[in-house]
Design a protein with these regions (language model features):
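TRNA-binding/sensing appendages of the translation machinery
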Residues: 1-81, 89, 137, 158
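Positively charged, Gly/Ser-enriched RNA/tRNA-binding surfaces
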Residues: 19-34, 45-46, 80-93, 97-152, ...
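A structural signal for short, well-ordered beta-strand segments and their strand-loop junctions
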Residues: 38-40, 102, 156-159, 260
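Beta-rich nucleic-acid/ligand-interaction surfaces
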Residues: 41-59, 160-170, 265-273, 367-371
């Protein structure tokens, strides 16, 4: 039997796995500094719940399976619904905002000819039980700071509101099929199809013109004013006021330099009600992540509660880091220790207790230990019976009395932080 992985799944080996852990830790640290708390949900959800709450857009991409009781289940295709279900079931009686975060895998089915991955790692936050510009701005700030923490040097966070397009679609008073086609074209950024739909028979010319204008509006604060001028007559002034207030807070927080207003953004999921956010890196072709406000989703579980959040794709972040030439700093082996087995065991135990990453070796001779340490990427080496460590690069000695700080921590303290 050939040892193969299923289509769309892959193994991750040492170096890449270490880099993914470093980036995950950096992003997680940002979440924690904003007072978000980690939660975990089951990998499977009831398929009927998935289908009823988030619709065919999401449920159609889910892996389905039947358990021994005959229940139809689905591997989670995204994290917003599991978090919403958790909040409704476990946090419905809580008072005040709930700040939840996660680092989890999601699974999506694709046709075999598409050649896409079917397992993805997502890092995200959900801010529950609070609404308004301040909470919208907080979600965007967390996203900006999380991307900064990854080490990416070039990225942009686009923000908009689904309320404008929905108001204009309502003003068109056309068929549900037309509205669905228009939203799909907007999400795909297919402006040719979008323009054709806005010029279709029965669509008021003023509304069609406003739609064609709005999806092309992007920029800074001035973009909000331009949208007011193009679409202000259809009842979306409140949504634009909220977006402008959020922009003010982004400027105050020092995040606006990474943010761009874009009224052409439209997420693929149907449950968004206001803020829409997506993150991009040059040349990637797909968003690094995204999210928005979904104030009606928890009502489907009988617990009405405003909510907003986002998810980042770890895989896409790693691709963007490589494309930008950003080297992820991974801490390797601090020291390789060999020599007399009993002495080696004592030294290894002592160093590990002090935070060192130590690889034990059965090698006894100094020349062989140096070569093995170099192959392992270790910073120091020693024989257990020696009184000091020896640096691999230049042969400098480091006494064990008092026990020194591990090399990675020492370097991090000099840099002023740990990555």
């Amino acid at each position: 039997m050939r040892p193969v992985t299923p289509r769309g799944f892959r193994d991750v080996l040492f170096e890449e796995a270490a880099e993914r852990r470093v980036v995950t830790a950096a992003v997680s640290d940002v979440f924690i500094r904003y007072a978000y708390r980690f939660v975990e949900t089951p990998a499977v959800e009831e398929y009927a719940t998935l289908e009823a709450v988030v619709g065919a857009t999401v449920s159609g991409a889910a892996f389905r399976l039947v358990d021994l009781d005959g229940s139809l289940l689905a591997l989670r295709p995204e994290m917003t619904l599991p978090i919403a279900r958790l909040a409704a079931a476990r946090l419905g009686g809580s008072s005040g905002p709930q700040r939840l975060c996660y680092a989890a895998d999601v699974y999506r089915e694709h046709a075999s000819l598409r050649g896409e991955s079917r397992q993805f790692a997502q890092l995200g936050v959900e801010l529950l039980a609070v609404s308004g510009p301040a909470s919208d701005a907080e979600v965007v700030c967390v996203l900006v700071d999380a991307l900064r923490a990854t080490g990416l040097t070039e990225f942009t966070v686009g923000v908009g509101t689904v309320a404008v397009l929905r108001a204009l679609i309502g003003a068109a008073a056309s068929t549900p099929e037309w509205a669905a086609s228009l939203m799909a074209a907007a999400h795909a950024r297919n402006l040719v199809a979008f323009d054709a739909l806005t010029a279709a028979q029965g669509v008021p010319s003023a509304v069609g013109s406003a739609l064609r204008t709005v999806v092309r509006i992007a920029g800074g604060r001035e973009a909000i004013a331009a949208c007011r001028e193009a679409a202000g007559a259809v009842g979306c002034a409140g949504a634009l006021d909220a977006l402008e207030s959020a922009w003010d807070l982004l400027e105050a927080a020092g995040a606006a330099d990474r943010v761009r207003v874009d009224f052409g953004i439209l997420r693929s999921f149907d449950y968004y009600t206001g803020l829409i956010v997506e993150a991009y890196a040059p040349g990637l072709g797909l968003p690094l992540g995204g999210g928005g406000r979904y104030d009606d989703l928890l009502a489907a579980f009988g617990t009405p509660m405003p909510a907003a959040g986002f998810a980042l794709s770890l895989e896409r972040v790693m691709i963007a880091l490589a494309a930008q030439g950003v080297e992820v700093a991974v801490r390797g082996v601090d020291a390789l220790v060999g020599g007399d087995p009993a002495a080696c065991a004592r030294v290894c135990s002592r160093l590990r207790a002090g935070g060192w990453r130590v690889q034990a070796s059965a090698t006894r001779t100094s020349d062989a230990l140096v070569g093995e340490a170099r192959d392992a990427g270790a910073v120091w080496w020693m024989a257990g019976e020696d009184a000091a460590l020896t640096r691999v690069s230049d042969g400098a000695a480091l006494a064990l009395e008092p026990l020194p700080a591990p090399p990675a921590l020492e370097a991090a303290n000099q840099r002023g932080g740990v990555r």
